[in-house]
A protein has these predicted regions:
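Non-heme Fe(II) oxygenase metal-center motifs and adjacent flexible, charged/small-residue loops
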Residues: 1-191
């Protein structure tokens, strides 16, 4: 990592952007292991996610969110190296990687916080690869947009401190965007 820029900061949380050389072999490793727009439960209704997803871990049985358990697939050597590298760079104990694939600008994820039961919320790190999309931050108290951050390839977004309790984040619909985007999100899972 060569540089870091702070884009959001409060007394108890922050969002930093870091430079990183991402190994594209990780894309090859996960490409065929992602579930295409799997089901989740939102407000008691079954619906499909608007992106493809996969969860990779050698320690966690899976990632439970929105009423469903996504079972973990084993880490490949490339993913294991990437996970170890993130833990060294951020002095964390991440043990799982959630991979999202956005096919184009109609794929999205709504405003949310990574604060589900079973994950430690003080550090969440995400690496982007592919087409630039908007990573939108909103204040939880009034839902106002705090920042629109371009997800440039190889950039790390590091949400730390109480960020998940103070803010939401999302990848909004951007109909004009045609390209593919992957995100690799690192967390510590206790299940």
């Amino acid at each position: 990592m060569t540089s870091s820029t702070t884009l959001v900061k409060t007394e108890s949380s922050y969002l930093n952007i870091h430079e990183y050389e991402f190994d594209e072999e990780c894309i090859t490793d996960v490409r065929d292991q992602l579930m295409e727009k799997p089901e989740i439960i939102v407000f008691g209704r079954v619906c499909h996610q608007h992106r493809s997803v996969g969860f990779f871990s050698d320690e966690s049985i899976g990632y439970k969110y929105s009423g469903k358990l996504m079972k973990s697939s084993p880490l490949t050597d490339n993913l294991r190296y990437l996970l170890r590298d993130m833990n060294e760079k951020f002095a964390t104990q991440f043990n799982g990687i959630l991979v999202n694939r956005y096919g184009d600008g109609s794929d999205y994820i709504s405003a949310h916080s990574d604060d589900e039961k079973g994950i430690k919320v003080n550090d969440v790190v995400s690496i982007s690869w592919g087409t630039v999309r908007t990573f939108r931050i909103r204040n939880k108290s009034d839902r106002k947009i705090v920042a629109n951050i371009p997800t440039e390839p190889g950039k790390i977004i590091h949400m730390g401190g109480e960020f998940q309790r103070e803010f939401t984040h999302e990848i909004p619909i951007e109909k004009k965007i045609q390209g593919l985007r992957y995100s690799f999100t690192f967390r510590h899972h206790s299940e």
